Swiss-Prot record:
UniProt GO molecular function: manganese ion binding; metalloaminopeptidase activity
Residues that hold Mn(2+) 2 according to the record: 262, 267, 285, 346
Catalytic activity of the protein: Release of an N-terminal amino acid, Xaa-|-Yaa-, in which Xaa is preferably Leu, but may be other amino acids including Pro although not Arg or Lys, and Yaa may be Pro. Amino acid amides and methyl esters are also readily hydrolyzed, but rates on arylamides are exceedingly low; Release of an N-terminal amino acid, preferentially leucine, but not glutamic or aspartic acids
Species for this entry: Rhizobium leguminosarum bv. trifolii (strain WSM2304)
Cofactor binding annotation: Binds 2 manganese ions per subunit.
HAMAP family for the chain: Cytosol_peptidase_M17
Enzyme Commission designation: 3.4.11.1, 3.4.11.10
Protein name per its UniProtKB record: Probable cytosol aminopeptidase
Job of this protein: Presumably involved in the processing and regular turnover of intracellular proteins. Catalyzes the removal of unsubstituted N-terminal amino acids from various peptides.
UniProt gene name: pepA
Length: 496
């Protein structure tokens, strides 16, 4: 459950109790709004005593003195004014949200002395608040005081010089928060609740936003020849699904942009079973599908001027008497045959059929797939960057730029013939793993064999989609990584 902020923007705020939040840079003598909130100079005295230097994302919490117009004052440090980025405004909003406790109304003075604060910055600050307050407590029957208060409504007035512009920009912020938090919800859901059929039903709910949604059943996928995807699913009693989402916000003649997500709702590893320790985290092996679903929610909610396709392959990978075996050979939708060496390298088998289907049907401008694909990428990049693999330099540059802008950072990894040959098979056209060395790269090469000449990028988000370190705007196990990144890519380069 998320805290319910009723956010509005104004040139001034009526201060009668509640909380006032002020922002201060290291190079300003005082915080914006200080003369309104603190005519007696309590902030300066408290800062001196606490040695508060306004270091980036630091906070000073003050109980207002008798006779003040508010009950509490929080000053948030921003560091140097000249160094402020869009992501800093998000972080400041998250830092502020964490300080809003035991109050039903808050005024935030967002303008920074000596620097013009844009409407976009005010909206980013508000977005940071919405992202920070997300929590997933659906299944808790007993909640502590903070959890009980999280569901209560708090009125937040953000004081800025351009409230009309901020309000307009904030409509996009609300759309983004909705998509990110949808992705987080999907990743956090327990696997007994969210199977392939249930996930597909969640995608179907996007129809209320104007998205066209088709759900392919096992019978339909078999007719298309999706033997790779179906091979993964055959060990589970829960039938697979392929959800196809279309947002038609661009011109009718414009080719769509396409996003494909791995949706393994639970991954035991199959017959090549994983160790028991930590297996519960494999409910998050559908983080790619969650991100694609969240992205489609954003694009429709903000009425993006683009044609976009989102496709998610939904399966459960289980050991069973009917499960796929190491040594099996399956035929993909492309007609290429695959020797299954390791049933725990299943995500690429799901993606290869979904990508081929997408390319064959929609002829998109590009395809970007997202997947919690390999542990090897976590070893290489940790939880800071997601791995980027691509056959197109322009698309890679655009993605890298969007990653820096949103702080959902990517690091481009190499591709080449010397890696590609590692997945050649003696018995089929290819095998589904190239061994322990260069595991993330050989996985990417496997996927690359199914994209033909279409510009393509593969984002390995195994280290960033779940269990990544908590920060100012994310306190959730499932982070929603990829939603803001890809929305920024579309916004910056592909809207008509």
């Amino acid at each position: 459950m998320s805290a319910k902020f009723e956010i509005s923007f104004s040139k001034s705020a009526k201060l009668t109790g509640g909380l006032a939040i002020l922002l201060k840079t290291t190079d300003a003598d005082s915080a914006a709004g200080a003369e309104t909130v603190d005519p007696a100079g309590v902030i300066a005295k408290a800062a001196r005593i606490a040695r508060f230097s306004a270091k980036s994302m630091s906070a000073l919490d003050i109980v207002a003195p008798e006779g003040a117009s508010v009950e509490r004052i929080v000053v948030i440090g921003l560091g140097k004014a000249a160094d402020l980025t869009a992501h800093d405004w998000l972080k400041a909003g998250g830092t502020a949200a964490a300080r809003i406790k035991n109050t039903d109304k808050t005024a935030v003075f967002i303008d920074v002395p000596g620097r013009e604060t844009s409407a976009r910055a005010a909206a980013d600050f508000a977005l940071g608040m919405l992202l920070r307050t997300y929590s997933f407590d659906t299944y808790k029957t007993k909640k502590n005081d903070d959890e009980e208060k999280a569901g209560k409504s708090v009125k937040v007035t953000i004081v800025t010089t351009d409230p009309a512009g901020a309000k307009k920009a904030f409509s996009d912020s609300e759309a983004i928060a909705g998509g990110v938090n949808l992705a987080r919800d999907l990743v956090n859901e327990p696997p007994n609740v969210l199977g392939p059929v249930e996930f597909a039903a969640k995608a179907k709910e996007l129809e209320k936003l104007g998205i066209e949604v088709e759900i392919l059943t096992e019978k339909e996928m078999r007719r298309f020849g999706m033997g790779a995807l179906l091979g993964v699913a055959q060990g589970s009693v829960r039938p697979p699904r392929l959800a196809v989402m279309q947002w038609k916000g661009g011109k009718a003649k414009d080719r769509p942009v396409a996003f494909i997500g791995k949706g393994v709702v639970f991954d035991t590893g199959g017959i090549s079973i994983k160790p028991a320790a930590g297996m519960e985290d494999m409910k998050g092996d559908m983080g790619g599908a969650a991100a694609v679903t969240g992205l489609m929610h954003v694009l429709a909610s903000r009425k993006a001027a683009v044609n976009a396709v989102g496709i998610i392959g939904l399966v459960e990978n289980m050991p069973d008497g009917n499960a796929q075996r190491p040594g099996d050979i399956v035929t993909s939708m492309s007609g290429q045959t695959i020797e299954v060496i390791n049933t725990d390298a299943e995500g690429r088998l799901v993606l290869c059929d979904a990508l081929w289907y997408c390319n064959d049907r929609f002829k998109p401008q590009f395809m970007i797939n997202l997947a919690t694909l390999t542990g090897a990428i976590v070893v290489a990049l940790g939880n800071v960057h997601a791995g980027l693999f691509s056959n197109d330099d322009q698309l890679s540059a655009q993605l890298t730029e969007a990653g820096l802008s949103t702080n959902e950072k990517l690091w481009r990894m190499p591709l080449g013939k010397d890696y590609d040959k590692l997945i050649d098979s003696k018995f089929a056209d290819m095998k589904n793993t190239g061994g322990r060395q260069a595991g993330s790269i050989t996985a990417a090469h496997f996927i690359k064999r199914f994209v033909q000449d279409t510009p393509w990028a593969h984002l390995d988000i195994a280290g960033t989609a779940m269990g990544s370190p908590q920060d100012e705007i994310n306190q959730s196990w499932g982070s929603g990584f990829g939603v803001r990144l890809l929305d920024e890519l579309v916004r910056a380069h592909y809207e008509s």
